[in-house]
Structure formats: C-alpha cells, structure tokens
Amino acid sequence: MVTIRADEISNIIRERIEQYNREVKIVNTGTVLQVGDGIARIHGLDEVMAGELVEFEEGTIGIALNLESNNVGVVLMGDGLLIQEGSSVKATGRIAQIPVSEAYLGRVINALAKPIDGRGEISASEFRLIESAAPGIISRRSVYEPLQTGLIAIDSMIPIGRGQRELIIGDRQTGKTAVATDTILNQQGQNVICVYVAIGQKASSVAQVVTTLQERGAMEYTIVVAETADSPATLQYLAPYTGAALAEYFMYRERHTLIIYDDPSKQAQAYRQMSLLLRRPPGREAYPGDVFYLHSRLLERAAKLSSSLGEGSMTALPIVETQSGDVSAYIPTNVISITDGQIFLSADLFNSGIRPAINVGISVSRVGSAAQIKAMKQVAGKLKLELAQFAELEAFAQFASDLDKATQNQLARGQRLRELLKQSQSAPLTVEEQIMTIYTGTNGYLDSLEVGQVRKFLVELRTYLKTNKPQFQEIISSTKTFTEEAEALLKEAIQEQMDRFILQEQA
C-alpha cells in the first residue's frame, strides 16, 4: 500500500497557491448578425468607439462606423469571405493607425501601409493615427516659398507655394496625372518628399507612373500609396488618409512634402458605396451628407507650419476628373471651395496640340505672386495679360476680314507666346530656363520667327545660354532677382543665338 505523505502534498499545494497569478481579461465582444458587400452588422460590442478597429474570429479587421441602438455597422478592410453569421468579433480599443518611418521612401504600399512592391517588409518603430487633426491657425504661417512644378504655364501664371492646396481639374485623358508626375520629377534635388496616392485607378496606370518615377530617379524621395479599382471600398476610402499621415510625419520633422491625391472623386464614390450599404440617408447625387467633410478634413491637413514648429510644409495637389467639362457637379464644386485655386485642363486645348492643356483664363492660384521668386514676378507680369488679350482677339478675328497692323502683330505675338508654353511630358524646366523663355517671348524676340520654329529655337537657346553664359544661371539662383547684369547677358545670348539660328535655317 502506497503511503500518503501529507507534508509533501501540503507543500505542493502551498507552492501552487503561491504561484497562482489571477489575471482577469475583460474583452468587449459581439456576434455577427449579417455580413455581405463589405459590411457586417454586429450585435454586442457595447462600448465600442466610433472609428474603432474590430477584429473578427478569422483575422479580418473592420472599422466601426455606424453605432446604432441595437447593432453596430462595421466596414471590412478585406473581402471577409470567411466571416460567418454567428461568429464572434472583439473590439481592439485602437483607432486606425499606421507605422511611419524614413524607410518608406522609394516603396509602393497599400492603405494599411503594407508593402506591395515585393521588396520585403518595412521597418518602423513609430505610429501615426490615419486621421489626425489639422494644424490650427496659430500653428500655421502664410505661404511664401515657391514649389516649382517645372511647367512654364503654372510657375509663371498660376504659381503654387509650399503649404498650398491646388486642385488639378479636367476631363479624362487631358494630362492631369502628367502634370502631377512632372511636378514630382521637378522636386529632384529640392529636398522635398513626395507622396503619390492612387485611389481606384487601373493597376496598369499606377505601374506606368511608378516606372516613370523609377526611370528618372524620382522614387528615391517618393512614396506611392496605391489602392486600385479592384480594392475594397473601405481601403479606397482610407488610402488618402494614409498618404496624409506619411506626409505629416515628414512635415513635423521640419521637411517639405508634396502629396498628390489621384483622385478624390473615386474616394467619394467608395465612401458613397459604404454609406449606402450602411443605410445612411443619401443626399445630392446619392452622396452622404458628410462628403464635404470627407474632403475638407483631408485637405486641411496640408499646411505651412509656423517657425516655432520648424517651418515644415505639406503641399496638396488633388486631381478631380470632370464629365465633359462640367465643373458645377457636386464633388468638383466641393473641392474647388476647399482648395486655394485650381488648374483647369481643357480637352479642346489638348486635342488641338497645346500640351500641357492648361486653360490659363479660368485657372487661378489664390496665393498668387507670394509664391514666386522676384525674378519670375519681374518677367511673368505681362504674360497672363497678353495671353488673355490674345484669346479675346483670336475669337474676334475669326469674324473680321481686314485687321489693322497692330492687331495682326498682337495676334502673331500671342501665337508665339502660346507656343512657348508648350512642353513635352517628363521634361520640366528649371526656374532660370523658364525666366529666359518668358523674357524671350514677351519682349518680341520670337516675332521674327515662324510659329513652327519657336520651340526649336528655344531649345537651342537654352543649351547655348547654359554653355556660353553660365553666369546668368548663377545670378538668378543666388540673388533670386532678374538684375540688369542678367538681362544684359540674356539679350547678348538671344542675339548671338538668333544670328546662328537664321544662318542654320538658310543653309
């Protein structure tokens, strides 16, 4: 018979009691009532916050958007094909946030900041809320530094400043994305971090943009956030906020950032889809009542920070597609009223060979010449006025048969000015080259050339000026002013190049 040693048993029991650690874990849970179309209705989750992340049994994450009396409406961040009626859901206690770090530069990521370029994980130790408050009035200062796009038409007449929000608007296939990518290419060497957010675009279009940026060495300072047309509506809705959170990370580190949203109207459509499925009441064009707030809270995050916060900046270029030039639709009017100006691209100009197809007459920058260097102000002042007068005259000249000499000269000058605004895609110009081009046109040096010769002459003049008069570039870049010395150098170069050009053409 086995002897029971009471002291040994009591020691074991005592040890177990001492080691016992009473941990009580309270989890806020609920049950799936209904799931489908990217939406789940949950019973329970009594203390869930608006916008809180919830986790389903099979691992899918969702966001609690509708808090109703007897259920919670959750939008899914994934297809949710494995979620079943009756399965459990738990609240995480967290609002949507993403990891942020310098390591994101040069990468292509999705709305959850996960890499989708097949180049491995991205290391990050810091997190930022996807939706954070925009800087207040005291935290900002007025926009005063230029953000050069490299496009003459924009930098001279519709200047963009660091911290500004400028809308790019136009019909499909008018070169809106091309204007944005050229602006990214022109930031090379300017110490500006660029974020390109593709919302609901074709995967082939996004791949094309990424390839262009890689070939030109621009991916080194660029982050691409992509949620293509086949992504769930929730992720298309979140993508712009993810891009803004990444740009803010750099802005608060005293850096300059440029963010391009391509395009917010697709985000509004995704949000409309989510809202209608959540049975929120529809408003104009079936968009929910808070669609203005959707875009205003996003674009208000763009700012030029005050000197106490390090003077970082975030410049936003939202791109909105219109239907047959109708800017009075709901989303275009909303975004126009939020932004500090718009660049209007016209299908008629594009089809007539004027590219970039910027309609200078109705494009505007509300920051204006505050976002230009002095040299640009000096030469570009006359340009917009002359082009506006030319557009008016051209319309009138179609009906008039005999025009006086002065009108003919003005029409000839206008045609040449319009010609100098044309640029090839992915060929941005430096400020010095732009100043030289505008000066040559507005001072009548191109009047003696045929319209077809203008671009060829300007290309050769830029090369000639760079090799034979390097002091011109030095003066403009160091003083930011179009001095008399710079003007004399430029006049000399134009005259010398004109003589060479005429001899070449005659030969």
Swiss-Prot record:
GO terms for cellular component: chloroplast thylakoid membrane; proton-transporting ATP synthase complex. It is a peripheral membrane protein. ATP binds at residues 170-177. The keyword Membrane applies. It is found in: Plastid, Chloroplast thylakoid membrane. PROSITE patterns: ATPASE_ALPHA_BETA. One of its GO terms (molecular function) is ATP binding. Coiled coil: none annotated. CDD domains: ATP-synt_F1_alpha_C, ATP-synt_F1_alpha_N, F1-ATPase_alpha_CD. The keyword Plastid applies. Its EC number is 7.1.2.2. It is an enzyme of class 7 (translocase). The record marks 363 as: Required for activity. It catalyses: ATP + H2O + 4 H(+)(in) = ADP + phosphate + 5 H(+)(out). Keywords: ATP synthesis, ATP-binding, CF(1), Chloroplast, Hydrogen ion transport, Ion transport, Membrane, Nucleotide-binding, Plastid, Thylakoid, Translocase, Transport. Pfam families: ATP-synt_ab (PF00006), ATP-synt_ab_C (PF00306), ATP-synt_ab_N (PF02874). F-type ATPases have 2 components, CF(1) - the catalytic core - and CF(0) - the membrane proton channel. CF(1) has five subunits: alpha(3), beta(3), gamma(1), delta(1), epsilon(1). CF(0) has four main subunits: a, b, b' and c. Produces ATP from ADP in the presence of a proton gradient across the membrane. The alpha chain is a regulatory subunit. Belongs to the ATPase alpha/beta chains family. This is ATP synthase subunit alpha, chloroplastic. It comes from Nicotiana sylvestris (Wood tobacco). The gene is atpA.
